[in-house]
């Protein structure tokens, strides 16, 4: 008996889709959505953003599903004070869909959107032309989005940064927050260029060679690709961008990897932003290749009768959540320092971050 910001957001646009498909009537859809939005107005929020988990029996913030309601009053690095970037991206996407589909509810929707500022998730500290800024403790990849923030515990104070991480992979589900943040002019275009399509080699400047991280541990290395320079259409600032790709072993199928091999990571934003038609040579193409990789690996390597792996609820009804994905664990992996004679040939950026033993229907449906 729990829910999350992502669940609420996806439910909102699922009801709109059900109305459009004739599965529920207009009055039924409106009543469901209005009831949900009204309930959300009573939930504890921060800057309009929802917390990680909520108890559906009383609306209280949960520590974790099955672990009871939060009782802490002093900020701590746990879910009682965590505001998730990606989950609130999905929540906001649901609000935006409802506002467009049901203008009669726009006043209620606007009251929920108004306090939200996605700039809070953006790391606006000084950038360099390298992949990271070595002048900031922890060699931080500034210009990217944080995975979230802890209420009352900002990342730039003391050693708080050790509890933070960046959503550095652009080809993952947090890019919904980048779309919304840029669309609302709450994030600069920097986030688009500074986020990584793949984990890059050191930037092509002499001063970056010793400070940029060594990503040779990633799933596939060495990686084909090249550095390109892009000019942001609004700021006119230029950015070096690594454009690489992975290749499915033994084939000419090239693709952009997700971080942990999940279908959801790559394809979910296409449900809201029509990448298939707007980005036929970029993320629309990447989405199609992701589905091809999932199908090829599941049927040929795992010999599964079904395909579609992604993080999801565990199949044991305990309320748990597990990381599942196509990581290419059946292919060679040598770890850090892999080279042309001993290449890593995995299918996801993070080797071992997920297991390949669960197929989830929502991932198959996305394709």
Regions found by a protein language model. Name each.
Residues 1-367:
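Ser/Thr/Asn(+Pro)-rich, low-complexity disordered segments
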